[in-house]
């Protein structure tokens, strides 16, 4: 696990954007795993700027989002399809049919199970995910894989924790239906990605970040599963990294890694 600590949330977004662009420019038919929530918005803003300045094209890119609420239409203001259209897809040249968000409008269990299986199959048919972007919840969730989620789990129906429902309540109007269920990629699905980049910013994420990086491997902190991934990069701002016991060591490692990259082995 590579831990990179940067001065600010803006620096985290710039680093993540550079990684995404590198994948797009390296792979013939790049496949990205995308996330929603407040943290990736800054990343998507940077990607739009890079596209508008003609530094990148998404024409040959395929994307798969981590999750979607169950029981609301794609067109709903708070659906993750709407989120992605608003913050990224509508502003770049990605082909609409190459963008995938779990189909979760139905509330029929059988239909949702089939949708989950189809999503897994679509990822495989695309050749797997080259780079999966992640955020982290205050309880350590990734995607909507809440505490106690199996590390072997695949795309499935998941009940949201109370803390997740409360955290997302601000996005829904008073009296409006707020889903308590989601269709989400499983932890096993995420771990199948060839590379993972998790972004975390702000003091509110510091405890979850510490548990993920320095805590035990445990289903109680779903993000700790990234300890098992051979190409997981955790990019933090100073506030999110503030509780790490080995913070100075991670910074030292990154300094030495940069020297090696530049050919300096002193």
From Swiss-Prot:
Indicate the residues that form the catalytic site. Answer: 67, 139, 141, 146
Per the UniProt entry, what are the Gene Ontology biological process annotations, in alphabetical order? carbohydrate metabolic process; glucosamine catabolic process; N-acetylglucosamine catabolic process; N-acetylneuraminate catabolic process
EC number(s) per entry: 3.5.99.6
Complexes and interactors:
Homohexamer.
- What catalytic activity is recorded? alpha-D-glucosamine 6-phosphate + H2O = beta-D-fructose 6-phosphate + NH4(+)
> A single GO molecular function, which one?
identical protein binding
- Native species of this protein? Marinomonas sp. (strain MWYL1)
Which keywords belong to this entry? Carbohydrate metabolism, Hydrolase
- What family classification does the UniProt entry report for this protein? Belongs to the glucosamine/galactosamine-6-phosphate isomerase family. NagB subfamily.
InterPro entries referenced in this protein's UniProt entry, alphabetically: Glc/Gal-6P_isomerase, Glucosamine6P_isomerase, Glucosamine6P_isomerase_CS, NagB/RpiA_transferase-like
Q: Which gene name does the record give?
A: nagB
Determine if Hydrolase is one of this entry's keywords.
yes
* The protein's annotated pathway: Amino-sugar metabolism; N-acetylneuraminate degradation; D-fructose 6-phosphate from N-acetylneuraminate: step 5/5
What PROSITE patterns is this protein classified in? GLC_GALNAC_ISOMERASE
This protein is called Glucosamine-6-phosphate deaminase
Query: Which Pfam families does this one have?
Result: Glucosamine_iso
Function of the protein: Catalyzes the reversible isomerization-deamination of glucosamine 6-phosphate (GlcN6P) to form fructose 6-phosphate (Fru6P) and ammonium ion.
GO cellular component term of the entry, any: cytoplasm
């Amino acid at each position: 696990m590579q831990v990179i600590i940067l001065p600010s949330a803006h620096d985290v977004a710039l680093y993540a954007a550079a990684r995404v662009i590198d994948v797009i420019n390296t792979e013939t038919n790049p496949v990205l795993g995308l996330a929603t929530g407040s943290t990736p918005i800054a990343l998507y803003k940077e990607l739009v700027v890079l596209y508008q300045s003609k530094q990148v094209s998404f024409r040959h890119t395929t994307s798969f989002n981590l999750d979607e609420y169950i029981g609301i239409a794609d067109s709903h203001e708070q659906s993750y399809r709407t989120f992605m259209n608003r913050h990224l897809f509508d502003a770049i040249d990605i082909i609409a049919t190459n963008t995938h968000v779990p189909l979760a409008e139905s509330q029929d269990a059988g239909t949702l199970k089939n949708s989950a299986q189809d999503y897994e199959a679509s990822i495989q048919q695309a050749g797997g995910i080259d780079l999966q972007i992640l955020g982290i919840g205050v309880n350590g969730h990734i995607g909507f894989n809440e505490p106690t989620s199996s590390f072997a789990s695949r795309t499935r129906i998941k009940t949201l924790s109370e803390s997740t429902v409360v955290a997302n309540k601000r996005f829904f109007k008073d009296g409006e239906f707020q889903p308590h269920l989601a269709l989400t990629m499983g932890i096993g699905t995420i771990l199948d990605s060839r590379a993972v980049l998790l972004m975390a910013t702000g003091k509110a994420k510091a405890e979850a970040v510490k548990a993920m990086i320095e805590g035990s491997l445990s289903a109680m902190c779903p993000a700790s599963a990234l300890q098992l991934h051979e190409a997981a990069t955790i990019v933090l701002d100073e506030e999110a990294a503030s509780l790490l016991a080995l913070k100075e060591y991670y910074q030292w490692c990154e300094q030495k890694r940069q020297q090696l990259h530049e050919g300096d082995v002193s």
